[in-house]
Amino acid sequence: MSEVRTGFLTMTTIILISIGLTMMGTGLYQKTTMSSCIRETSSQFTLLGLLLLLIPQIGLYGICCRSKRLFNFFFYGMVVLIIIVSYYSIKCSIYNTTFGIAKNPAKDNRTVPQLLGRLVSKEKFEKVTYCIIHKHDCNYNASKNSNVWKYCCAQPVGCGTITMFDKPGEWSWKHQYERNQVPEECSYEYCLDCRGCQLSILKAIVHQWKYLSMFAYPALVLSCISLAIAWSLKETIHENEDYRGSYS
């Protein structure tokens, strides 16, 4: 029976390691390729991936080496991991259920002041907006899961072919073209003050938590299963000392 439980524990730890590796790889990749203002992942995402990568590995070593000490480190490490993953899972659930913004932010009946301060601080919102303004960070990858491109960076209706920078048909923020003389309603600051734009920025910030929940929920379930199996095996793990002896 203990062999079966050991097999299940090995499988769950391998899956947890795979989730952690995926999270770390995704976080590091997006850090180099995605917008520095709005990302799907954050430092918390990468940190959680690192914990999921390291702690289950201790369990694998403990099982393979029949090491009581390593297995105890794994057991208490999983307790800490479950507490951390539970915290993020609860936070993800709160964001996803109470902070949903319409797919088309411009049609959301709520105003930005109504939403600021509850789950997204005013400082966080202003920091992201400030980042967009000063880095002109409106490339497609900056907002592939939000409408920031559509509601903040696209040319406003009625502005014709006049653009913020001298490149017909689009606004380019990655290259500093010679600035055109544009009407006030076509200015970048004007667009960032639009409700649809502001709500789309909020939606992009909250999307980080929706993306994290895709990994946090299954990681929490598997961590609880691993801990339960580890508890049942805790007293059966003993170091194999058969190889230790003396030669005559």
Curated annotation (Swiss-Prot):
Disulfide bond positions: none
A GO biological-process term: auxin-activated signaling pathway
Pfam families for this protein: Tetraspanin (PF00335)
Gene Ontology terms: cellular component: membrane
InterPro entries: TET_plant (IPR044991), Tetraspanin/Peripherin (IPR018499)
Spans within the Cytoplasmic topological domain: 1-7, 66-69, 232-248
Transmembrane segments: 8-28, 45-65, 70-90, 211-231
Domain of life: Eukaryota
Residues with attached carbohydrate: N96, N109, N141
Stretches in topological domain Extracellular: 29-44, 91-210
Keywords of this entry: Glycoprotein, Membrane, Transmembrane, Transmembrane helix
Membrane topology: Multi-pass membrane protein
Presence of the UniProt keyword NADP in the record: no
Compartment(s): Membrane
Record function comment: May be involved in the regulation of cell differentiation.
Family: Belongs to the tetraspanin (TM4SF) family.
Protein name: Tetraspanin-17
Organism encoding this protein: Arabidopsis thaliana
Gene: TET17
